[in-house]
Amino acid sequence: MNRMLGYLKGYERESVLAPLFKMLEATFDLFVPLVMADIVNVGITAHDLHYILVRCGLLLLLAFIGLTCSLTAQYFSAKAAVGYSTALRHALFAHIQSLSFSEMDTLGTSTLITRMTSDVNQVQSGLNLFLRLFLRSPFVVLGAMVMAFTVNARAAMIFVVTIPLLSVVVFGVMVVTRPLYKTVQTRLDRVLGLTRENLTGVRVVRAFDKEQSEIDRFEDANALLTGMQLHVGHLSALMNPLTYVLINLAIVALLYVGSIEINVGGMASGDVIALVNYMNQILVELVKLANLIVQISKALACAGRVQAVLDTKPGMTFPAELLGEVAADKTGDAVRFDHVGLTYAGAGAPSLTDISFTAKKGQTIGVIGGTGSGKSSLVNLIPRFYDATEGSVEIFGRPVASYPRDALRGRVAMVMQKAQLFGGTIRSNLLWGNKDATDADLWAALETAQAADFVRAKPLGLDEPVEQGGRNLSGGQKQRLTIARALVGKPDILILDDSASALDYATDAALRKALAALPGALTVFIVSQRAASLQHADQILVLDDGHLVGIGTHRALRSSCPVYEEIYESQFKKGEAEA
């Protein structure tokens, strides 16, 4: 938690001034019952209207000063809380960006979204309340007791007994409920995860007529959340009635003692009113304190969850400078896998086993295999989205781990299976590949990606708006734009991870022809389910259950690799295959 407090840096002044101004407000509030007692004891008893008006003016002055102090404290506490949450959110987002795919897979997208939004907001609200009330409420409680002694020491002993009892109730409820709020947040994560999963896959749910099944899953998770929230709510709800009972008993005792003191001349009636007002002030502040404790319990639980993400160490480190030298016998290599294995965190079986091959500069490498054979896992190792658990992966004669992050990403461009575009324009999305690219560079990339025609047909061309996720574009258009985005950076290695699946055969063929015609020694990896898309590749890697079962040209594999032959024949008629 000490690290969490570090995000208050720059707001130390506000963090001190906010509670101080609340204490000033409380100080003026503590004088109000004494002024009211004077009005009753002196003004009303003596029928002195002038005295009453003067004291009423004093009450208005105290109220005005208290309001000014309160507004000032609100301003400083809000500024500190918002500044803190902004710094925390920035730090959390930056830390998430530093995590590898492995940590992202472990934590989960919905969990990280919850940490960034709901949890940080809860911490902000808790801090805001804390700065305003953590000194004011105890100060008023203790101050009211001290002021009660200035009125009547015997009656004030009731405060001495009542306040510890109230403290036991308040802090007892806090101790019991705080760990339960952590459970509530965990179950809330589960509900949010199910919601996100369902909304993301809503078309699949409806296609398989699983609406009722999903409703049942959600209701089960929601019932667990509701049950825990009710349990915590019932425990927290005990606080108010218990405190009210104790306060009311204390007021009854005050009235009893006060009546006796008045009869013997030890107190005036105004003094009893002052003592009751002090007791009511204690009640109000303890209710505030109780609510503060509930909010702080939630905020601490959320802060702990945010801290857990911040404590997650990135599984990968990148050097600041390029390391090592290229061996003379590897100068022509673009990518080299040497007995590579990969096992994902938490997975029971390896996804890749003993993979070895070399891709030369300028070659086109096809990757094919059945579903779950490890195709994406293999190409994900090249840009170092994951680290191999066995063996070594090299690009251009050096281990991928020897490249700084920006240098590696500059040389290797990858187009993912799912075409992901961001809200903005076509131009802004393409500039992700190279922020300094000219319009000529953008159009050249679009021509190669077979996207220039449909972009020219748009009313605004490169400045045509793109909705979040590319919702206003077809699947094929999105895929071609993501390919163009990768080409804008002019990489040395281009990886197309089944990223032309939405293209027709003619467009797919034109794309491959355009890639082959690019100047320079661009090495291309094409992951595809279509054997036809890989026929002209210099090498084709055939994967089966994480093993490399075949490597060679299309013609060689048809005669030497049963898995490849089976895939090919399943996509073409027997006569066409033989032709």
Predicted ranges, named:
Residues M1-F31, M36, I44-L60, I65, ...:
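Membrane-integrated ABC transporters
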